[in-house]
Curated annotation (Swiss-Prot):
It comes from Rippkaea orientalis (strain PCC 8801 / RF-1) (Cyanothece sp. (strain PCC 8801)). The gene is petA. Keywords: Electron transport, Heme, Iron, Membrane, Metal-binding, Photosynthesis, Signal, Thylakoid, Transmembrane, Transmembrane helix, Transport. NCBIfam families: PRK02693.1. GO terms for cellular component: plasma membrane-derived thylakoid membrane. HAMAP family: Cytb6_f_cytF. This is Cytochrome f. Pfam families: Apocytochr_F_C, Apocytochr_F_N.
Amino acid sequence: MRTPDFSAIWQASKQLTARIILLAFATFALYVFHDLAFPQGAAAYPFWAQQTAPETPREATGRIVCANCHLAQKPAEVEIPQSVLPDTVFEAVVKIPYDLDSQQVLGDGSKGGLNVGAVLMLPEGFKIAPEDRIPEEMKEKIEGLYFQPYREDQENVVIVGPLPGDQYQEIVFPVLSPDPATNKSIEFGKYSVHLGANRGRGQVYPTGELSNNNAFKASKAGTVTEISQTEEGGYSVTVTTSEGDVVETIPPGPELIVTKGQQVAAGDALTNNPNVGGFGQKDTEVVLQSPGRIKGLMVFLAGIMLAQILLVIKKKQVERVQAAEMNF
């Protein structure tokens, strides 16, 4: 185990109270209803992971399942104290950076701002702090957020989102550490923390169907002989091959980059790639520190300091005796 970070321990020891804000379920329900009723508009946000992997969001390989729908890789960070004391509340700060000037393709083909979402896998026994335990200062940081357990019996795995990205590039999770004195299944030591965070819409729905947030490609080699616009605002591209005509249907959103009469090979892009978002994953660690160990260490350090002081005093006494003998 690493040497304790005393600044982090001291900070954690001052956080004696904590709480989580329970807010507008109706607002969250509105988000959920919108995404279920119009899935093209906000695909593959954290709760979609619950459908594709209901047991755990982390695969055996260590990959978070959100990466199955968000194919582009983007950075994500999580900042937590190096060590925490039992039964204390601390902040886990998730950072989801992106260019705020970016505009993503929405389900209807129009452009709009990016949303963000995250899944935070805490160690067993750690959970979102109840409202009455959250300090007022921290409560201000989590105002407007709704944290949901990944499963009803899995409080240590938490999801949040979708949220407007221009307001929530940083998301604060108020986390309550467990107490081994009351929970015998928990032990002091070092534990892993896993984060998965996305910004923007995904490229694949949980059903495996592609969203319109993709670059669409030719399935066969041939010549583009016809391009027509569909009623929905997309395109129908006819490619004449040696085996006949192949019609490629492109939903609204991506921009065509081919023209009539152009030769294309199988796999060539017919459109640009409109995706400006992506998924990021980050792993870190936290130490659940024993107060007894800290006290013992403090006593040990105090003993060393006392021994040094006594040695200095003893040295002075010896020097006085030697000086007296020389004068005699």
